Amino acid sequence: MSHRKFSAPRHGHLGFLPHKRSHRHRGKVKTWPRDDPSQPVHLTAFLGYKAGMTHTLREVHRPGLKISKREEVEAVTIVETPPLVVVGVVGYVATPRGLRSFKTIFAEHLSDECRRRFYKDWHKSKKKAFTKACKRWRDADGKKQLQKDFAAMKKYCKVIRVIVHTQMKLLPFRQKKAHIMEVQLNGGTVAEKVAWAQARLEKQVPVHSVFSQNEIIDVIAVTKGRGIKGVTSRWHTKKLPRKTHKGLRKVACIGAWHPARVGCSIARAGQKGYHHRTELNKKIYRIGRGLHMEDGKVVKNNASTSYDVTDKSITPLGGFPHYGEVNNDFVMLKGCIAGTKKRVITLRKSLLVHHSRQALENIELKFIDTTSKFGHGRFQTAQEKRAFMGPQKKHLEKEKPETSGDL
């Protein structure tokens, strides 16, 4: 007669408690990479939006492995990353209790999608945010005070961060409210950082100026929400035997009689998903350029490779499910990342210095799949589908000449 195994290690990690809904929607950077003054001034993080997944084919270049010189199919995630707009500078001074904000300077002009973030109901508001801050840039006394503030930053501050926001008008979303974030500047002296930030106020910063191909980065995001779940789904506890009274997907014992309370380490039902998570060491397989004009023509071959020279875009046939088309710059990351489609993703430079062969391997893609993600896709491009299917009714109706209505 069979019975369940009573002794087993605990299920679930206690380091992520409490398992409750995150109070922030955008991933927060809690630790920044160590500053290196010998390098040029650069941003250490970027914001993007998860579009979807596809797969690639490449040849492995890691001598000594059995799979070296062999082709490998890998899943990748596409994160759309339109240029960020720099709208402010923040200086921090070092105190015995840590960093303290010293000065915050905003740009003269802030777009409506940025100012919307400071209102709960933009339509009913008076829309007067930053009107006083902007006046400082227009009169002589205000300009003198701004120069004094920038000089004080160079003299007293130890850490310089810039305030950036995303451009929602470039994305296929209904949302108009931009996401705003402070991003730390690393490299160079404090004076060079302040000058870098001052020169880029109200200007766009593209993703290829922050990251590069083959770089290892960290991904910070809020996971996909699953709602209220039981212990078997939430903690992966073992199901009880079939004849158990009052249910199988439960915990048989929730603790001893005394202490007369349920311990915090006992698996219980509750919220699953929508947790703030940081995933380390994601490799960038490609930084693609969005649709752009060259010699009067629209260039959209950001999914072509040296082996597959087909003129095709990274957007699959029919668009990414629940997202749409990717028309801006994008970052292709190996594997999956946290969050659902359209979720804002924080990309941060790695905190570690990588020396492994896998991290230093040069990635050369042979093929990027662009078939439809709504089913079992067969065609890579719309032209390939039309050549195989032949003329369809909708194409014949377009080519049919218009008949006059006069008899």
Swiss-Prot record:
Residues 1-35, 383-407 are annotated as: Disordered. Coiled coil: none annotated. One of its GO terms (molecular function) is RNA binding. Keywords: Ribonucleoprotein, Ribosomal protein. It comes from the Eukaryota. Residues 1-31 have a biased composition (Basic residues). GO terms for biological process: translation. GO terms for cellular component: cytosolic large ribosomal subunit. Residues 394-407 have a biased composition (Basic and acidic residues). Belongs to the universal ribosomal protein uL3 family. Component of the large ribosomal subunit in striated muscle cells. PANTHER family: 60S RIBOSOMAL PROTEIN L3-RELATED, RIBOSOMAL PROTEIN UL3-LIKE. Heart- and skeletal muscle-specific component of the ribosome, which regulates muscle function. Component of the large ribosomal subunit in striated muscle cells: replaces the RPL3 paralog in the ribosome in these cells. The ribosome is a large ribonucleoprotein complex responsible for the synthesis of proteins in the cell. Inhibits myotube growth and muscle function. This is Large ribosomal subunit protein uL3-like. It comes from Bos taurus (Bovine). The gene is RPL3L.
